[in-house]
């Protein structure tokens, strides 16, 4: 039997079972749980390699994959493992062992490599599902490219451009604006979903927006987050199977957090920036993260907690919410939202799996290109501060890695009823995939695929003789010029009303579903329900009498060494 050294094997095919990989410059170590590629039968493209006619490429005709990613190290809530990934017509059709069953053992019938199959060599690369950002203020279309090149492939939120309403609230108000945004975004290489304005006690006004194509409703305090609009929006949501997102009442004008909880009345709801610096009942909105019917999210400016977090928030808040620093009441409003104690608790609650989702709050107290970056910075900070999770050991951080990747992939997908389409690497799902070199994981992807087509990549000088000479910058690829490799997420009611046809939309529209029959217990690796207490004088956060807090830090992983400053 021919043998190969471990070093040579890893250089040729990437890591295998029980090998460990460090994620960029963090202290997070993953361990490969399983390798499906079958030793001695691995497939690889290139000079002197085996993906050739009659070898690992079948000579037969058949309905074979359009694209196979070979020897991919998959990091997903479903596991951390190595496999080949097959894509056909934009969807994942197989995960396992690819090749030619005429001469190779163990080949998955859905992963037969044929003449029509192209190859992406994923040896030594990490593959994740595309990120999902559910807190987008659609202030500028330039956000889309910024998010895409960070590894985000789905954007859900509201807005129409830099209006005062959009700058402050994630609402696309009314049928006219919803139709306009569905049309305006159909040629971008990104999945979109738009939230209608939920701030109305008029059920017909809410219903009109859902029929127009909104995938959900957003309630925001700047429009008045009263008990009546909360109840009305949730009634319509239950009737039409859409999600409601909420930014609650910082000033407690219409009631306190207990009144909002009462108005919600046990119905499922997605709470934005549940810590409160981004907005919400002062000082105790964070209590809502502990309820089973609440799907709690953070926005990224407060994550992770650093020495600069508090200082930068005041100016951000004044701009985003149309406040004036010459007006005393406006300054006091801003100050009430920024509490070091609850911000310090947020990191720990994420690490415990109490907070479930990470998002951006793009250009409205959030950074659209840093959802993934800050998720992994937070995971690393928490490992350094709190040590290994009890579910992990001293050798790897697989449980923590699954917990944190779920926060921006499968959990936001579940929350908004799109998990049957996107959010994980599973057969039958849309092939929105991101490829990373381990040394750049979480910071700078190597390739971004939408619907199985390459839409973005780090690429070198176009006039160079090879694709790698500097300057290496992100560029749109050919797949970015299509519209069939991206989705619009809309309501079923809008499909029943033939809205895509009436608007002559070019891209595929699919319905959100199962938004109302879920709870926090359905969220992956982040399903903890706790009784959270907030001291009204000191703002300290406790669970079962234990102080929940974390330290602000002076430095982070995935920071300056990766960026030109």
Curated annotation (Swiss-Prot):
Residues involved in substrate binding: 220
Reaction catalysed by this enzyme: urea + 2 H2O + H(+) = hydrogencarbonate + 2 NH4(+)
EC annotation from Swiss-Prot or TrEMBL: 3.5.1.5
InterPro entries: Amidohydro-rel, Metal-dep_hydrolase_composite, Metal_Hydrolase, Urease_alpha_N_dom, Urease_alpha_subunit, Urease_AS, Urease_asu, Urease_asu_c
Cofactor(s) for this UniProt protein: Ni cation
Entry GO terms, CC: cytoplasm
N6-carboxylysine: residues carrying this PTM: 218
Binding site for Ni(2+) 1: 135, 137, 218, 361
Domain (Urease) ranges: 130-565
Involved pathway(s): Nitrogen metabolism; urea degradation; CO(2) and NH(3) from urea (urease route): step 1/1
Entry note: cofactor: Binds 2 nickel ions per subunit.
Coiled coil: none
Superkingdom of origin organism: Bacteria
Subunit note: Heterohexamer of 3 UreA (alpha) and 3 UreB (beta) subunits.
Recorded family membership: Belongs to the metallo-dependent hydrolases superfamily. Urease alpha subunit family.
Name listed for the protein in its UniProt record: Urease subunit beta
Organism: Campylobacter lari
């Amino acid at each position: 039997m021919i043998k190969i050294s471990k070093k040579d094997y890893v250089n040729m095919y990437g890591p295998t079972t029980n090998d460990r990989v460090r994620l960029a410059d963090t202290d997070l170590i993953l361990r490969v749980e399983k390798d499906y590629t079958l030793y001695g039968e691995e497939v690889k493209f290139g000079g002197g390699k085996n993906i050739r006619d009659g070898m690992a490429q079948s000579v037969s005709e058949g309905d074979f994959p359009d694209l196979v990613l070979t020897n991919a190290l998959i990091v997903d809530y479903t596991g951390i493992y190595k496999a080949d990934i097959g894509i056909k017509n934009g969807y994942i059709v197989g995960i396992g062992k690819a090749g030619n069953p005429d001469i190779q053992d163990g080949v998955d019938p859905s992963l037969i490599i044929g003449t029509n199959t192209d190859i992406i060599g994923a040896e030594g690369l990490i593959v994740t599902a595309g990120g999902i950002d559910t807190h987008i203020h659609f202030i500028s279309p330039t956000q889309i490219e910024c998010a895409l090149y960070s590894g985000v492939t789905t954007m859900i939120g509201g807005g129409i451009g830099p209006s005062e309403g959009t700058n402050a609230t994630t609402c696309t108000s009314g049928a006219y604006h919803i139709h306009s945004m569905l049309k305006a975004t159909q040629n971008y290489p990104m999945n979109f979903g738009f939230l209608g304005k939920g701030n109305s006690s008029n059920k017909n006004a809410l219903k009109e927006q859902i029929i127009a194509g909104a995938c959900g409703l957003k309630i925001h305090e700047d429009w008045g987050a009263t008990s009546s609009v909360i109840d009305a929006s949730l009634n319509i949501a239950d009737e039409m199977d859409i999600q409601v997102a909420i930014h609650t009442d910082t000033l407690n004008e219409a009631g306190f957090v207990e009144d909002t909880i009462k108005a919600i009345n046990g119905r499922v709801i997605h709470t934005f920036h549940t810590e409160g610096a981004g907005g919400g009942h002062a000082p105790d909105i964070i209590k809502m993260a502990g309820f089973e019917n609440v799907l709690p999210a953070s926005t990224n400016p407060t994550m992770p907690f650093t020495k600069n977090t508090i200082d930068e928030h005041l100016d951000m808040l004044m701009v985003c919410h149309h406040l004036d620093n010459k007006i005393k009441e406006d300054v006091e409003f801003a100050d009430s939202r920024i509490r070091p104690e609850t911000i310090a608790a947020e990191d720990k609650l994420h690490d415990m799996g109490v907070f479930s989702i990470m998002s951006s709050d793009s250009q409205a107290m959030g950074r659209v290109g840093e959802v993934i970056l800050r998720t992994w910075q937070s995971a690393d900070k928490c490992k350094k501060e709190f040590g290994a999770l009890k579910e992990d050991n001293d050798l790897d951080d697989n449980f923590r890695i699954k917990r944190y990747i779920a926060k921006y992939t499968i959990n936001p997908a579940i929350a908004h009823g799109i998990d049957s389409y996107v959010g994980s690497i599973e057969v039958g799902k849309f092939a929105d995939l991101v490829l990373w070199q381990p040394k750049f994981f979480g910071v700078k992807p190597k390739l971004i695929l939408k619907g199985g087509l390459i839409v973005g990549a780090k690429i070198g000088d176009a006039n160079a003789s090879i694709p790698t000479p500097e300057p290496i910058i992100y560029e749109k690829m050919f797949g970015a010029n299509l519209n069939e490799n991206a989705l619009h997420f809309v309501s079923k009611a809008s499909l029943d009303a033939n809205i895509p046809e009436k608007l002559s939309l070019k891209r595929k529209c699919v319905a959100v579903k199962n938004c109302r029959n879920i709870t926090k217990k359905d969220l992956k690796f982040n399903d903890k329900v706790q009784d959270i207490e907030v001291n009204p004088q000191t703002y300290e956060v406790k669970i079962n009498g234990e102080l929940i807090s974390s330290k602000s830090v002076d430095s982070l992983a995935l920071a300056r060494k990766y960026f030109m400053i």
